[in-house]
Every structure is written in structure tokens, then in C-alpha cells.
């Protein structure tokens, strides 16, 4: 059984017991979160596609960690102008473990 749900402007295909990284959610570690934006639920040959969401569909997850991704470097460079700009960024993310798929 798997489901496709929406969180942080992205779609995620998950199965029960899977760990997935999402955009940062303001929750404590160990908290339970429910996602109602379920786009599709599949159980074998039985596929339920929402329009746009599955009625009664729910993905339940537990927050495992709140962390930051590795640093990426952004470089802007203009040739022959002695102009160079460099910046770095670390994006926050929330790692959740899927504990249940209902629907």
C-alpha cells in the first residue's frame, strides 16, 4: 500500500514505515502529524485517485528530526569586471516516519 500526498508545495510517494524529508514543519521531535492533502492511495490493484484530494484520505507520520541540509554555495560572476559574489545557504528540513495510511 502506498500513497501520494502534498506537503510544502511538493508531492511525496510514501509507504508505511518509510522515512521521508519534508520542508520544515514547526513541530517538536516525537510529535504526530496528519496530512489530509492525499492525492492518491493505492492498495494492490485498488487505486483511489482524488479530484483533487481523496475524500477521507489521511497520512499519519511521526517527526523524527529537525535538521539542516548540507551547505550549498552560490557564486555570481561577471567576466572581465573583477566582480564576484559568493554566498552560502543551508535549508531547514523535517524528517518524518510514516506510521499509517488511511483511506
Swiss-Prot record:
Superkingdom, natural source: Bacteria
GO cellular component, one term: cytoplasm
Record field: transmembrane: none
Gene Ontology biological-process entries: translation
InterPro entries named among the record's database cross-references: bL21-like (IPR028909), bL21-like_sf (IPR036164), Ribosomal_bL21 (IPR001787), Ribosomal_bL21_CS (IPR018258)
A matching Pfam family: Ribosomal_L21p
An annotated Gene Ontology molecular function: structural constituent of ribosome
PROSITE patterns in UniProt: RIBOSOMAL_L21
Disulphides: none
Keywords per UniProt: Ribonucleoprotein, Ribosomal protein, RNA-binding, rRNA-binding
UniProt xrefs under PANTHER family: 50S RIBOSOMAL PROTEIN L21, LARGE RIBOSOMAL SUBUNIT PROTEIN BL21M
Summary of the function given for this chain in its UniProt record: This protein binds to 23S rRNA in the presence of protein L20.
Subunit structure comment from the entry: Part of the 50S ribosomal subunit. Contacts protein L20.
Designated name of the protein: Large ribosomal subunit protein bL21
Amino acid at each position: 500500500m502506498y500513497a501520494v500526498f502534498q506537503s510544502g508545495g511538493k508531492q511525496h510517494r510514501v509507504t508505511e514505515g518509510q522515512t521521508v524529508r519534508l520542508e520544515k514543519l514547526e513541530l517538536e521531535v516525537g510529535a504526530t502529524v496528519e496530512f489530509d492533502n492525499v492525492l492518491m492511495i493505492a492498495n494492490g490493484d485498488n487505486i483511489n485517485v482524488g479530484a483533487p484530494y481523496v475524500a477521507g484520505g489521511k497520512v499519519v507520520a511521526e517527526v523524527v528530526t529537525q535538521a539542516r541540509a548540507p551547505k550549498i554555495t552560490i557564486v555570481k560572476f561577471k567576466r572581465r569586471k573583477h566582480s564576484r559574489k559568493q554566498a552560502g545557504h543551508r535549508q531547514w528540513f523535517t524528517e518524518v516516519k510514516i506510521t499509517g495510511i488511511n483511506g
